[in-house]
């Protein structure tokens, strides 16, 4: 026993020594890019799309100065950035959603995001969380590596070359699309789909597809991220099986599949065994969401990349897609079986039903109310003493939940909405395509689609903060499809889980409120 305790102490010391603070400088700029061959103005990090890949190790802290150099009067010039999938324990103010966790950062200023990834590892991403700004380009991948990954024996290669982003792309600027959306009530249709920032549209130039290089005999962990504003993708690689192992930064029992649906904001890790003849193979991610009849530029089947074996000629593949087994919710079981709070079918401490309706298109209601952003961030109101819904303005869509409680959320089916919960993972105890509850080993993730069926998930309130729950179709969020959980309000103010509030965060609201509307 003494040896065991000493070993644990030494391991903890080694882990502490290895932990580091990693700094990534983000220059937020307007530049003209043509990821699908059509040149347009963009809002991007460091002049590139997708944005800079952030790579750290489990236990590290992150420091990201954001230098807002936006100048274009045709797009939003203020900004906020969400670090999607991170719990932000004690740093709810760094989570990013505008008017939930912070005021937006004005142009010609620098704001530094600082947070610890603590015990988290896996596949994450980041994006603007101000209006629909990320549809203009502010989105990128974020990976936290675990040197002691319990599933690490399944793969040989896991680095920047195996991070794969899936996105849709618009030729029209997001503010203009917003105006069209709110005047017509019709969701905008994208012009093209991109893999790793490259794609094509009907009638456009034959821009080169992205190439993912592999070597025969090696196993590759592909971290596939849907950095989309609306559609979902069906990911596959011709002539190759895939082994699913991670969903939304949570590792699951390995399952052999041929393809997987990945909804907006979801992340999936799959292992590809490069065991086929040396050649070129299509990597496919056809989109669902957006009617091509309403945009002649769109060809959903042109969301392609090339898997190229070492030694293969530099030509496009001639392989053919053969549909196979698609990953099912019922096959997804986290390797850490313990869920949030109480396992088993015992009653939750609090049950919430969210009824979605759209009586006044394009606006959405939840329980009869459409979400409207407050002028003072919800978190700041909590830190100022708000303890009840009536203490928060506006109060209608703020749900106060007590600490250390099991919360069950039920969403009856209504349309296709990938819901994302900030600050937590949740257990999907009733999937939208099932009629049987699973309280033993349900899928665990932070984004799940409500696809016309009854969906129920559970989470445990062990992380005080202000946490958004919203549809990750950006146009639906803009139309009010959201609520906010105000978790353990008093514990945000004082105690061991109280919020860390840097001065530059406190300065954001006065700075933002002082600028003219055209700069907001």
Curated annotation (Swiss-Prot):
InterPro entries in the cross-refs: Cu-oxidase-like_N, Cu-oxidase_2nd, Cu-oxidase_C, Cu-oxidase_fam, Cu_oxidase_CS, Cu_oxidase_Cu_BS, Cupredoxin
Gene Ontology BP terms: lignin catabolic process
Binding site for Cu cation 3: 129, 422, 470
GO cellular component: extracellular region
Record-listed Cu cation 2 binding positions: 84, 127, 472
Segment forming the signal sequence: 1-19
Glycosylated residues in this chain: 108, 241, 299, 492
Protein location: Secreted
Entry keyword Secreted: yes
EC category name: oxidoreductase
Keywords in alphabetical order: Copper, Disulfide bond, Glycoprotein, Lignin degradation, Metal-binding, Oxidoreductase, Repeat, Secreted, Signal
Disulfide feature: 103-509, 135-229
Binding sites annotated in the UniProt record for Cu cation 1: 82, 420
Main location class: secreted
Keyword Oxidoreductase in record: yes
Cofactor(s) in the UniProt record: Cu cation
The organism's place on the tree of life at top rank: Eukaryota
Binding of Cu cation 4, residues: 417, 471, 476
Catalytic activity field: 4 hydroquinone + O2 = 4 benzosemiquinone + 2 H2O
GO molecular function terms noted in the UniProt entry: copper ion binding; hydroquinone:oxygen oxidoreductase activity
Family: Belongs to the multicopper oxidase family.
UniProt protein name: Laccase-2
